[in-house]
Amino acid sequence: MLELPGMTTRRFFVYIPRQGAPVAITHAIEQGPWAGWPAKWTKEKYSSWRLLESLLADVVKGKRIAMEYSPGDAVPYLDRVPAGVLEMVRNAGATVVSSADLVSLFYAVWSDEQRASHERAARAVATIGQQAIRLAGSRADSASPLTEYALQSWIRERFEAGGLETDHGPIVAIGPNAANPHYEPAAEKSATINRGDILLVDLWAREKNGVFADQTWMGSLGPPSDRDKTIWLAVRDGRDAAISLLQQRISAREPVRGGEVDDAARAVITKRGYGDFFIHRTGHSIDPRDLHGSGPHIDNLETREERALIPGVGFSIEPGVYLAGDVGMRSEVNGFIGADKVLITPTDYQKDLLVV
């Protein structure tokens, strides 16, 4: 959050009190990056470890300090402070607690402008995702059917043409490849998309300096089998159970935790007999900076996410079922918590397999 310029290789500490001026403890040879530190705020300098420990004790002794750590590594994305540093701060006389809720409030909340940017990106991503599946269907019976890699490249071209940016991907996968949740095609290794295939397209993009939209669309190149329809319905209904819980709690202004939303989706898929094949969390934080953000995740499988979904945070909802060596299906939408309602994007999210 400090976004310090230049090189910093030595330890530094910044204490931000509830009231009063912040204090920075910095190394004597690394003063350049701190040139922008306001003069009215305190900045201490040290060279020796003895002076560092003394200054730290002067600042934090007897205080309750929030730091980026997660007790028991319950949420590893928040567990960023080395164990030795925690010991150092505690030995200086401070009581250390997790900053998890502060991260949600001060780092993960979207502005109105960011929400609007996300909504625009979501509309564009939804259009491109569906167009990609239809394109694959139209080429399946031709003399030149598309490969997964070719369709991936087409999607990236559409992003660029629409003024959107992405970091990598998207995921384009058929059949057994789709059973790997993080599969990505490559030019040298990519399956051909043929009639009869189940096609998964997971794509994400944003406007420049905007908030990502992250969606997964499922297609069937020809009528799906009864088994495939059953899997799709389990995934879709699990997604909708998560959305329903969010809508009920937020409209009633009742708290809801990320882990509870994961439980709601997982209960439906488990009841349908596919619980053992839903092998990842239901969703991840999407914060103003990162696709996989630092706010509350929709997770009670991989991690114990007990943070509340507070107004202003965004996240994905993406349950899936993966039968190794056979087929994988996932449905992904995004959620944003408003004051008394939940925004789901895209607004016209997928209800049925897109048969092409």
Give a label for each model feature.
Residues 1-356:
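Active-site neighborhoods and metal-handling regions in enzymes and metal-associated proteins
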